Amino acid sequence: YHSIMETLRIVEKFVPELEIIVVNDGSKDNTKAEIERAIKQDSRVRMVSSEKNRGKGNAIIAGVSQVEGKYVAFVDADLELNPSQLEGYLKKMLDDNKDVVIGCKFLKDSKLDYPFKRKVISMGYYIMLLVLFHLNVKDTQTGLKVFRVEAIKPVAHLIRTSGFAYDIELLVAIHRRGFSIAQIPVEV
């Protein structure tokens, strides 16, 4: 509940017309009740709910299918990355005419501290994506991403991966269709 309302409070400052679609992917705790509480408080909040956990990919497909706006943003529910950073993502998208803007923890100006070992593993992962898919994206797993609806809606439901590799397959599909992808530093 608090992360939903906090996201609304932050994002409405720079995107006055917004909707928040929260996907409840079969949670067994009080998540559904908390989402319903947020819906009662603000009509811009909507819920897509599944009785059983179907994985991140299916949750994204369910959420994207309900989008009515021009842009789609992914924000992890734990708010590890502050949603206020989305303002910079939208600015980059509009100023540079990009179709997708994703956060990248491994850009020079990112403000975080990762162990050297993790950086080396991530670099190997990046090289693999570049060689196999010609995808020049250093960090596919960051919890903040913004898409133009015309870049994501036609492909979201075509992705076969239901787990966390969904992001990779989605970005590869978008890239192969000629849409542009930009990366922006993140702050944890």
Q: Over which residues does each language-model region extend?
A:
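Short, well-formed alpha-helical segments that are part of the catalytic scaffolds
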Residues: 1-13
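Short loop->beta transition adjacent to catalytic acidic/histidine clusters or analogous donor-positioning motifs
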Residues: 12-22, 30, 43-46
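Catalytic donor-sugar/metal-binding loop of nucleotide-sugar-dependent glycosyltransferases
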Residues: 136, 160-162, 171-187
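Short active-site alpha-helical segment characteristic of glycosyltransferases
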Residues: 81, 166-173
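Acceptor/aglycone-binding surface of glycosyltransferases and processive sugar-polymer synthases
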Residues: 44, 50-66, 71, 83-164
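Short beta-strand-to-loop acidic/aromatic patch adjacent to the donor-nucleotide binding site
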Residues: 70-78
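A conserved acidic beta->alpha catalytic loop
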Residues: 1, 24-33, 79
